[in-house]
């Protein structure tokens, strides 16, 4: 594959997915174990998440992605692209005030949030923003179960 013939990150990922041996592409160290993601896992997660996102956005809508560096970040970014959305990445070090400014500026239709720590920073902002149609979490948040 010649990199100058690749049009976008989705195409690059798919080319790699097609040619790799389907072993682990990511290793995520967790508290007491390592979570492995195979190429097939990542591919199927991108498709599933993209299908979910597509229910709530139209082409060109923004999706705010609040996450640490972890495999789900890349999966989310590619899923947003596949859905026709625009990823608005946000640092996890932002304050509630920072997030409110970003949310007001980009009007995201979907929020993708890594964990409870990040959710608590924007929890009070969400009810005021009628344009937010869906919140997706990487980790389980008790409040939403």
Sequence positions of predicted segments:
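Flexible, non-catalytic linker and terminal segments flanking ANL/adenylate-forming cores
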Residues: 1-8
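Generic alpha-helical structural signal
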Residues: 10-14, 43, 47-50, 123
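AMP-dependent adenylate-forming
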Residues: 12-38, 142-143
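Residue-level preference for short coil/turn positions at secondary-structure junctions
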Residues: 20-22, 59, 107, 131
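Conserved AMP-binding/adenylate-forming core of the ANL superfamily
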Residues: 25-74, 78, 95-100
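Short hydrophobic alpha-helices that are characteristic scaffold elements of the AMP-binding
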Residues: 77-83, 105
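Structural core segment of the AMP-binding/adenylate-forming
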Residues: 86-145
């Amino acid at each position: 594959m010649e990199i100058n013939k690749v049009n976008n990150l989705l195409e690059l990922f798919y080319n790699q997915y097609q040619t790799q041996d389907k072993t682990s592409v990511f290793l995520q160290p967790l508290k007491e174990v390592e979570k492995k993601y195979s190429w097939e896992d990542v591919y199927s997660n991108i498709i599933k998440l993209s299908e979910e996102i597509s229910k709530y956005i139209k082409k060109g809508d923004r999706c705010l992605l609040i996450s640490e560096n972890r495999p789900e970040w890349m999966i989310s970014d590619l899923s947003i692209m596949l859905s026709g959305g625009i990823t608005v990445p946000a640092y996890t070090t932002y304050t509630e005030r920072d997030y409110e400014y970003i949310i007001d500026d980009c009007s995201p239709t979907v929020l993708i949030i890594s964990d409870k720590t990040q959710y608590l920073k924007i929890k009070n902002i969400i009810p005021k923003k009628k344009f937010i149609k869906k919140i997706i979490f990487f980790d389980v948040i008790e409040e939403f179960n």
